[in-house]
Amino acid sequence: MARAGPAWLLLAIWVVLPSWLSSAKVSSLIERISDPKDLKKLLRTRNNVLVLYSKSEVAAENHLRLLSTVAQAVKGQGTICWVDCGDAESRKLCKKMKVDLSPKDKKVELFHYQDGAFHTEYNRAVTFKSIVAFLKDPKGPPLWEEDPGAKDVVHLDSEKDFRRLLKKEEKPLLIMFYAPWCSMCKRMMPHFQKAATQLRGHAVLAGMNVYSSEFENIKEEYSVRGFPTICYFEKGRFLFQYDNYGSTAEDIVEWLKNPQPPQPQVPETPWADEGGSVYHLTDEDFDQFVKEHSSVLVMFHAPWCGHCKKMKPEFEKAAEALHGEADSSGVLAAVDATVNKALAERFHISEFPTLKYFKNGEKYAVPVLRTKKKFLEWMQNPEAPPPPEPTWEEQQTSVLHLVGDNFRETLKKKKHTLVMFYAPWCPHCKKVIPHFTATADAFKDDRKIACAAVDCVKDKNQDLCQQEAVKGYPTFHYYHYGKFAEKYDSDRTELGFTNYIRALREGDHERLGKKKEEL
């Protein structure tokens, strides 16, 4: 009997310990739920919810410890819940929410719900930083450090981290200051991280997202005026920016063998200073010029515009040809709209290049002209251009063109909707429109499916496009009965779209078949 006491005590401790540990580690900010009605109510009242479903209480322990710290960091911005599917009371809830923890190696699932509906399964890195970043921007891109290829880049999160690295690092240090939305940064990141791996042990390459206003001091100190800005340091001392050099991994590695200050940029000679037969007009002399010349074709341009640069030689050749004619049919002129803003505003110039024709001082519309031949043909016989082609929205197609006012109500009526957010001027959008239109026509007889489009340039749609986290064109989102389900990132072709939608319908048929079997 003398030995029975300790054995009984040990058993009691073993039984109580898991429960005691969990209660000590789980934050009060994590809501434990077992009743389907409670979860339904919570999803109705909170618009950003991450739910941990676990096979048992023990299986959830590590995640709960991590999520307790996350809950504190996102307090007021997101909600974290826990459902123990091993608990008899919670099994019904897990089944209702389609949580499958039957595989032996699957102990937990993390599901995210937004605006009352399922958004996505959390499949990013299970770390404090990644989950916090996700809950602060559920539709945003993953952190750079989540990329397995970026393991050799030092990722800095705070000014304290930045100052500490400058103080301790003895090796040459190259830091990329970036913003998560910056497309040029995204294009350069794979090269930067490849260079970091190649230079491991010889130099340190670091990355720091300084888009937030909390980093204004750093941006001011190192002249970060745009993204990416790459700065070079030696023994904690800033020397110069990596600028006007190549952006490939090979370029970076080669440059770090012998770091040099930025190469001086050779300023472009303004078109007006190049000479030639094109007349360059200003706010001050424009009106007088078009009065004195009975036939004038004017090109409104911007120095940075690639299409303008491509068109300029053809425009110059046409001007020279007209200049050499004994009985010239007119003259060609140009206006730098970035300098002569009064003229640009007066003639509603919103894109470049834009052509305007003036006959005896009166303005006329001009069709699309881009070559010397077309310019000369037009000047010899200026005529009213053919009516413009109907816009996508004006064409008779099966695509639903939505605006902010009817967006939600229309989508709620369709089980599956693929929405294309676009801008009419966007070349990538123009390329994909025929494919998207053909897809809509292919499914026009299926009442549960729709292909819809939103013109984000329209004033009435700009708030909607911002709410839907549209950061580039075209962007494709899939909605299930009006609720955002996922972003479409597959092939932007008719085949890609139709395969995606067919897979959705096949899933419907499979679920319907299973229900019939159960009945």
Swiss-Prot record:
Instruction: Give the enzyme class.
Output: isomerase
The places in or outside the cell where this protein is found are: Endoplasmic reticulum lumen
Domain of life of the organism encoding this protein: Eukaryota
The terms under GO molecular function for this entry are: oxidoreductase activity; protein disulfide isomerase activity; protein-disulfide reductase activity
- Write out the GO biological process terms: electron transport chain; protein folding
Motif Prevents secretion from ER, residue range(s) on this chain: 516-519
- All residue ranges annotated as the Thioredoxin domain in the record: 134-261, 270-384, 378-506
Q: Name one GO cellular component term.
A: endoplasmic reticulum
Disulfide links within the chain: C85-C94, C182-C185, C305-C308, C426-C429
The catalytic activity, as recorded, is: Catalyzes the rearrangement of -S-S- bonds in proteins
Q: Name one Pfam family in it.
A: Thioredoxin
Enumerate the Gene3D superfamilies for this protein: Glutaredoxin (3.40.30.10)
According to its UniProt record, which protein family does this protein belong to? Belongs to the protein disulfide isomerase family.
Q: What is this protein called?
A: Protein disulfide-isomerase A5
Gene name tied to this protein: PDIA5
